[in-house]
UniProtKB/Swiss-Prot annotation:
Function: Catalyzes the formation of phosphatidylethanolamine (PtdEtn) from phosphatidylserine (PtdSer).
E.C. code: 4.1.1.65
Active site: 190 (schiff-base intermediate with substrate)
Protein name: Phosphatidylserine decarboxylase proenzyme
Necessary cofactors: pyruvate
EC top class named in words: lyase
PANTHER family associated with the record: ARCHAETIDYLSERINE DECARBOXYLASE PROENZYME-RELATED
Site residues, Cleavage (non-hydrolytic): 189-190
Entry's family note: Belongs to the phosphatidylserine decarboxylase family. PSD-A subfamily.
Cofactor stoichiometry and binding remark: Binds 1 pyruvoyl group covalently per subunit.
Domain of life, source organism: Bacteria
Entry PTM: Is synthesized initially as an inactive proenzyme. Formation of the active enzyme involves a self-maturation process in which the active site pyruvoyl group is generated from an internal serine residue via an autocatalytic post-translational modification. Two non-identical subunits are generated from the proenzyme in this reaction, and the pyruvate is formed at the N-terminus of the alpha chain, which is derived from the carboxyl end of the proenzyme.
Length: 232
C-alpha cells in the first residue's frame, strides 16, 4: 500500500453538508478559548466530534442487480412484511421491509440500495418519536424515494427520530442513481426503511450491524458466484 493510500484510508473526508457545523464549532472553540484557555480544548474536542459525525468514507459496493445493499450504517432493527406507506404508491399488498437504525455515532450518509431512476420524492411532516418504534414509519417526519430498479420498484424512506430533526435529500425525480450512490443524510440519529418487491429475500438478521453501500441486506434469486465491487 502506498503512502497516499495509507493517508487516504486514515483521514476520512467530511461531507460538505457538515462544513458549516464544523466551522461553527471551531469558531466557538476560539471564542471559548479567548474567555478561558482550557475551554478551547473542550471546544476543539467537540469540533472533532462534529467532523467525525459528518464523515463520508468511501465504500466498496457490490455490482450485481440481484443484490440489495444497505442504505446506511447502523443496526438492523426490523424485518417485516408490511403494507408500504401510501405516499410511495407501490402496492396495497405487503412488501418486505428492512429497517436500519442509525445512532449518533454511525455514518449518516444515505446511499441507494439498488441502481435505477428515481420515480418520485415525497416529503411528509410528522412527529419525532423514537425511530426504533414501528409506528415511526407512518407517524414521524419522513422523506420517501421510489427507485425503479432492475428487479422492480423499491421504496427508500428516511425517517427522523427523537434527536434527528433535519432530513436532507439532494436527489430529484428522474435522476439516475448508481447502487451505493449518495442521495441524502439525516442529522443526529434516525432510521432508513427499504421496501422491496416480491422475490426479494433478506440476507441479514435483526440486531446485525450493516455498512451503508457494502452490506448485502437482500437478494433476488440465488448467488451466481463472485461479485465485482466498486468504490462509491
Amino acid at each position: 500500500m502506498s503512502l497516499f493510500d495509507t493517508i487516504r484510508n486514515t483521514l476520512v473526508p467530511v461531507h460538505k453538508e457538515g462544513y458549516i457545523f464544523v466551522g461553527a464549532f471551531f469558531v466557538g472553540s476560539l471564542v471559548l478559548g479567548w474567555i478561558w484557555e482550557p475551554l478551547f480544548w473542550v471546544g476543539l474536542l467537540l469540533t472533532l466530534w462534529c467532523a467525525y459525525f459528518f464523515r463520508d468514507p468511501e465504500r466498496l459496493t457490490p455490482q450485481d442487480d440481484d443484490l440489495v445493499v444497505s442504505p446506511a450504517d447502523g443496526r438492523v432493527s426490523m424485518i417485516q412484511m408490511v403494507i408500504p406507506p401510501e405516499e410511495l404508491q407501490l402496492s396495497s399488498d405487503p412488501m418486505l421491509r428492512i429497517s436500519i437504525f442509525m445512532n449518533v455515532f454511525d455514518v449518516h450518509i444515505n446511499r441507494a440500495p439498488v441502481r435505477g431512476a428515481i420515480r418520485q420524492v415525497v416529503y411528509r411532516e410528522g412527529s419525532f418519536l423514537n425511530a426504533e418504534l414501528d409506528k415511526a414509519s407512518t407517524d414521524n417526519e419522513r422523506n420517501s424515494l421510489v427507485i425503479d430498479g432492475p428487479r422492480g420498484a423499491i421504496g427508500v424512506v428516511q425517517i427522523a427520530g427523537l434527536v434527528a430533526r433535519r432530513i436532507l435529500c439532494w436527489s430529484v425525480p428522474g435522476q439516475a442513481l448508481g447502487v451505493g450512490e449518495r442521495f441524502g443524510l439525516i442529522r443526529f440519529g434516525s432510521r432508513l426503511d427499504v421496501y422491496l418487491p416480491a422475490g426479494a429475500e433478506p440476507r441479514v438478521a435483526v440486531g446485525q450491524r450493516s455498512i451503508g453501500g457494502e452490506t448485502v441486506i437482500a437478494e433476488y434469486g440465488s448467488a451466481k458466484g463472485p461479485v465485482i465491487s466498486r468504490r462509491s
